[in-house]
A protein has these predicted regions:
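Conserved catalytic-core segments of large NTP-driven translation/proteostasis enzymes
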Residues: 179-217, 225-324
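Short, ordered loop/turn segments at secondary-structure junctions
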Residues: 12-15, 25, 109, 131-135, ...
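Conserved C-terminal guanine-recognition region of P-loop GTPase G domains, centered on the G4
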Residues: 126-183
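Intrinsic disorder/low-complexity segments
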Residues: 66-99, 213-231
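P-loop NTPase switch module centered on the Walker A-proximal segment
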Residues: 1-68, 98-130, 136, 143, ...
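Switch/connector loops and helix/strand junctions flanking conserved nucleotide-binding motifs
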Residues: 33-35, 111, 137-138, 163-169, ...
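Hydrophobic regular secondary-structure detector
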Residues: 6-9, 19, 23, 155, ...
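Alpha-helical scaffold elements adjacent to nucleotide-binding pockets in ATP/GTP-utilizing enzyme cores
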Residues: 23-24, 115-118, 122, 139-146, ...
Length: 324
């Protein structure tokens, strides 16, 4: 789990969230330039037509992190997270190597605050994108407060700094007043041209903590006390779901504890609905099947459920054997 980072991009409408996500996927080689199309994560026709994000689209990117070059990781915008107290400060300086960056590109329009809040629950951090010419807008504030309520690490990013209308000093001051961060913590980028986007990828690894399994930490403590290691039940948060005419109900989940293997008998803890995990995997950004979903990972589960009412957003998926 030390090489997993779960994060989202939050901002006001039209401040460049989807464009930044596109650049990240290009730089990490998740999508080739030949297959790239503008605002790739905005899968609905209406989204591309109107230029807004409605449906959450998670994607896993493989990023090779190196420790050379650049300043030491900043902690000024690192909000105190419950995982720090749970794992006893286990989230230390990142080690060089391959990292899984799990991105959820969230809506920025005022009407979709519920979609933002449910995606934040699946993350440890957020990239806050602010238009360098428009500054902090009302919806930006609303989303930042949602992130603060979830105790997420926040990485401030000023976008569109290459435009003539950009007022970097003024908007930087707004961000500093909002987050209480240093000016050096703010990354100045142009998502359209790709300027300084590699710095954002580095900051995600350096400033956002790795996921932690709360039940695994408790099990370790119990084992240290009495020498017995209890079993860890599987728990996965559903942050989105939809019905596919050919495959049934498909869930987007964040695995909090345990694992979900392909073929497992699963149960929804709130509704009591039971089903089968016909296929599990991650999205890069298309579905890529895996043998199982591990702790801390974000991915999908293809089920044999017939309606999304059986697997509601915010419900917890567990294995049948833990619910009997």
């Amino acid at each position: 789990m030390e090489h997993i980072r779960n994060f989202c991009i939050i901002a006001h409408i039209d401040h460049g969230k989807s464009t930044l996500a596109d650049r990240m996927m290009e730089l990490t080689g998740t999508v080739t330039k030949r297959d790239m199309k503008q605002q790739l994560l905005d899968s609905m026709d209406l989204e591309r037509e109107k230029g807004i994000t409605i449906k959450l689209a998670p994607v896993r990117m493989k990023y090779e992190y190196t420790s050379e070059a650049g300043a030491a990781p900043s902690t000024a915008t690192r909000l105190v997270s419950p995982v720090d107290s749970i794992d006893g400060g286990r989230n230390t300086a990142p080690q060089p190597g391959a990292y899984d960056l799990n991105l959820i590109d969230t809506p920025g329009h005022v009407d979709f605050s519920y979609e933002v809040s449910r995606s934040l629950q699946a993350c440890e951090g957020a990239v806050l994108v602010v238009d360098a010419s428009q500054g902090i807008q009302a919806q930006t504030l609303a989303n930042v407060y949602l992130a603060m309520e979830q105790d997420l690490a926040i990485i401030p990013v000023l976008n569109k700094v290459d435009l003539p209308a950009a007022d970097v000093p003024r908007v930087s001051k707004q961000v500093i007043n909002l987050l209480g961060c240093d000016e050096s913590d703010i990354i100045h980028i142009s998502a359209k041209t790709g300027q300084n986007v590699p710095q954002v990828l580095r900051a995600i690894v350096e400033r956002i903590p790795a996921p932690v399994s709360p039940l695994a930490v408790q099990a370790e403590r119990m084992a240290a006390q009495d020498g017995k290691t209890p079993s860890i039940p599987t728990r996965a948060l559903i942050f989105d779901s939809y019905y596919d005419d050919y495959r049934g109900v498909i869930l987007y989940v964040r695995v909090v504890d345990g694992t979900i293997p392909k073929g497992a008998d699963i149960t929804m803890m709130a509704t009591g609905a039971r089903g089968l995990a016909l296929e599990v995997g991650h999205l890069s950004p298309t579905m890529q099947p895996d043998p199982l979903l591990g702790t801390g990972e974000i991915g999908y589960i293809v089920t044999n459920l017939k309606t999304t009412r059986e697997a509601r957003v915010g419900d917890t998926v567990t294995l049948k054997k833990y619910f009997e």
